[in-house]
């Protein structure tokens, strides 16, 4: 040991790399809007809304329903219905392979979850798209679950609510998926005849066959802030008309300004706002929300 080593403080001992504790994956989330780095638990507690800029991130169907419905008395509708490859469809991959991958990634059997329950004790049936499952595409299972949810609302004589988050009809089911547009709108006609409220909540994104069928048929049509809503995507429209679209075109704020939707509601206030609407539509007393 040299005289210089004796003067210097002892070195910090190196630990075995295998014994070091790393930061768990997914502990932090980056806001896609303001790019702030956020603690995941804070984001989850805030219903996936950025606490810095209020950007509404995409949220899973079950998380959304957990934040909407009262904890007691929930029941799922149509979970036993699963997709089948009736057409033996194959593009770059087989349809069953795509389904299996989506099921493994999301834990769901298709792109919609339907539950019965209550919002501030007011009984409802609520359907919600799972965008992570093949882009929330509407196939025969989604259409059937929607129809069964509406039928359950008819039988229970309660309002029906649907949160949309979809790229449109599922191409792997071809005409079968397009038939769901007629099927879902027909069920809403029955709800209207029974004078039962249907509230449609448009979230990011609501496109294609979903926006062209039942999404805008609500007695009240709500959207989340800055949600992308339309039929064809903005890039497709620009390429077709060969013109630059206005800023904010197909966003919720643009649709509210032009009268296509009724209101924009922050996700954190959605439960209370829907409860107030239901009480108003059903002529419930004010103390029903206590």
Curated annotation (Swiss-Prot):
Every CoA carboxyltransferase N-terminal domain range: 27-290
GO BP annotation list: fatty acid biosynthetic process; malonyl-CoA biosynthetic process
UniProt cross-references to Gene3D superfamilies, sorted A to Z: 2-enoyl-CoA Hydratase, Chain A, domain 1 (3.90.226.10)
Amino acids binding Zn(2+): 31, 34, 50, 53
Record's subcellular location: Cytoplasm
Cofactor binding remark: Binds 1 zinc ion per subunit.
Cofactor(s) this protein requires: Zn(2+)
Gene: accD
GO cellular component entries: acetate CoA-transferase complex
EC number: 2.1.3.15
Gene Ontology MF: a single term: acetyl-CoA carboxylase activity
HAMAP family: AcetylCoA_CT_beta
Protein function: Component of the acetyl coenzyme A carboxylase (ACC) complex. Biotin carboxylase (BC) catalyzes the carboxylation of biotin on its carrier protein (BCCP) and then the CO(2) group is transferred by the transcarboxylase to acetyl-CoA to form malonyl-CoA.
Domain of life, source organism: Bacteria
Residue intervals of every C4-type zinc finger in the record: 31-53
Catalytic activity reported: N(6)-carboxybiotinyl-L-lysyl-[protein] + acetyl-CoA = N(6)-biotinyl-L-lysyl-[protein] + malonyl-CoA
InterPro entries for this protein: AcCoA_carboxyl_beta, Acetyl_CoA_COase_Trfase_b_su, ClpP/crotonase-like_dom_sf, COA_CT_N, Znf-ACC
Protein name per its UniProtKB record: Acetyl-coenzyme A carboxylase carboxyl transferase subunit beta
Organism: Burkholderia cenocepacia (strain ATCC BAA-245 / DSM 16553 / LMG 16656 / NCTC 13227 / J2315 / CF5610) (Burkholderia cepacia (strain J2315))
Protein family: Belongs to the AccD/PCCB family.
Pathway assigned in UniProt: Lipid metabolism; malonyl-CoA biosynthesis; malonyl-CoA from acetyl-CoA: step 1/1
NCBIfam families linked to this entry: accD
Keywords for this protein: ATP-binding, Cytoplasm, Fatty acid biosynthesis, Fatty acid metabolism, Lipid biosynthesis, Lipid metabolism, Metal-binding, Nucleotide-binding, Transferase, Zinc, Zinc-finger
Subunit structure, as described in the record: Acetyl-CoA carboxylase is a heterohexamer composed of biotin carboxyl carrier protein (AccB), biotin carboxylase (AccC) and two subunits each of ACCase subunit alpha (AccA) and ACCase subunit beta (AccD).
């Amino acid at each position: 040991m040299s005289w210089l080593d004796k003067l210097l403080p002892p070195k910090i001992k190196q630990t075995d790399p295998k014994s070091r504790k790393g930061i768990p994956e997914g502990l932090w989330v980056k806001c896609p809007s303001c790019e702030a780095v956020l603690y995941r638990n804070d984001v989850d507690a805030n219903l996936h809304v950025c606490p810095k800029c209020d950007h509404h991130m995409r949220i899973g169907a079950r998380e959304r329903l957990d934040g909407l419905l009262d904890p007691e008395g929930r029941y799922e509708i149509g979970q036993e219905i699963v997709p089948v490859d009736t057409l033996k469809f194959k593009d770059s991959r087989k349809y069953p392979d795509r389904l299996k991958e989506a099921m493994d990634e999301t834990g769901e059997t298709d792109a919609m979850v339907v539950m019965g329950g209550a919002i501030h004790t007011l009984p409802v049936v609520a359907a919600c798209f799972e965008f992570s499952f093949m882009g929330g595409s509407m196939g025969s299972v989604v259409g059937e679950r929607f129809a069964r949810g509406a039928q359950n609302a008819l039988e229970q004589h309660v309002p029906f609510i649907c949160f949309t988050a979809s790229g449109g009809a599922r191409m792997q089911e071809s005409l079968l998926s397009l038939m769901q547009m007629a099927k879902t709108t027909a069920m809403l006609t029955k709800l209207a005849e029974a004078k039962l409220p249907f509230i449609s909540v448009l979230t990011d994104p609501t496109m294609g066959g979903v926006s062209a069928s039942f999404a805008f048929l609500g007695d009240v049509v709500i959207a989340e802030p800055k949600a992308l809503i339309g039929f064809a995507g903005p890039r497709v429209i620009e390429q077709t008309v060969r013109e630059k679209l206005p800023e904010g075109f197909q966003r919720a704020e643009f649709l509210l300004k032009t009268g296509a939707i009724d209101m924009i509601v922050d996700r954190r206030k959605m439960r209370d706002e829907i409860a107030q609407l239901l009480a108003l539509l059903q002529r419930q007393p004010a103390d029903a929300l206590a």
